[in-house]
């Protein structure tokens, strides 16, 4: 009985490791790299609150520039 439990844990561990190694982790990294150029990201961008409104709000808050990055308004210093 103990051998079966150990085998099950080993198989589960290998499945988790294989799944993790085969997943595309660069998909998660890409937005972080692009937003790293911006200092502050806050409200989501929508059809009513777009790039122009975001840039205006950022400049109003005394940031150098701003725009929608991956669906969020991000301001640059």
From Swiss-Prot:
Keywords attached to this entry: Antimicrobial, Disulfide bond, Fungicide, Plant defense, Secreted, Signal
The protein's name: Putative defensin-like protein 60
Disulfide bonds: 41-75, 45-68, 54-73, 58-74
Subcellular location: Secreted
Principal location class: secreted
GO cellular component terms attached to this protein's record: extracellular region
Family: Belongs to the DEFL family.
Pfam families tied to this protein: Defensin (PF24552)
GO BP, one annotated term: defense response to fungus
InterPro entries, alphabetized: Defensin-like_dom (IPR056373)
Signal peptide from the UniProt entry: 1-25
